Amino acid sequence: LKEIKRLAENNEITPCSEYGSISFEDTQPAYIAHLLGYVDRESLSKLKIVCNAGNGGAGPTINAIEQMLPFEFIKVHHEADGTFPNGVPNPLLVENRGPTIEAIHSSGADLGIAWDGDFDRCFFFDENGRFIEGYYIVGLLAQSFLEAEPGGKIVHDPRLTWNTIEIAQEFSGQAIQ
C-alpha cells in the first residue's frame, strides 16, 4: 500500500495494457446456506423477533431467510436506504437503541436483533428490551463452536477478552485476538 501511495503521490501511474472486468454474482443463496449450516432448524422454537436492519444491508437477507425459519419477524427500519433516514445504523451507540427497544415492548417480542449499516455486526436485546453486551454473545458462540469442535480456535475482538478467553480455556480451545 505504501508503494501504491508513493506512485499516486508522484503521479507515476502507468496505463495498463489490458483492462479488467466486472462481474456480478448473487452470493446470497450461498451465504444463507452457510448461516443455516450452523442451525438445527428442526429444534428451533417459534419466536417473535424484532429485526432492526437500520436501513442498511441486513433487510434483503432477513427477507430471504424469513420463510426458512419458524420465527415471526417484526421489521424495523427494514428498507435499505443509504441516506439512513433513521440515523446512523450503529446499535452499539446507546442513543440508537430506542427503536429496537420500543418495538420489543410494543410487540411482546422474545428478543431483538439490530444490525449495523453494512451488516457485519449484530447486537442483541432480551425480551425486556435490555441490551446484551457483546462479550456475552461472543462467549455463547465460542462455547457452541467449541462444543461442536473441541480444541478449535476462536478469533475475537480484543475488546471482548475475559469471557472469551475463559470459555476457550474451559473447552480446550484457543482464543486468538
Q: Where are the language model's segments positioned?
A:
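Short gly/pro/ser/thr-enriched loop/turn and capping motifs at secondary-structure boundaries
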Residues: 80-84, 121, 139-140, 162
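Gly/Ser/Thr-rich loops at beta-strand to alpha-helix junctions
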Residues: 55-59, 119-120, 160-162
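Short acidic, glycine/serine/threonine-rich loops at helix termini
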Residues: 60-64, 85-88, 122-127, 164-170
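Glycine-rich phosphate-binding loop
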Residues: 104-126, 131, 173-177
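Gly/Ser/Thr-enriched, mixed-charge loops and adjacent short helices
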Residues: 1-107
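Proline/glycine-rich low-complexity loops and linkers
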Residues: 2-33, 37-39, 128-177
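Solvent-exposed alpha-helices and their adjacent loops that cap or buttress functional pockets
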Residues: 39-45, 102-107, 116, 124, ...
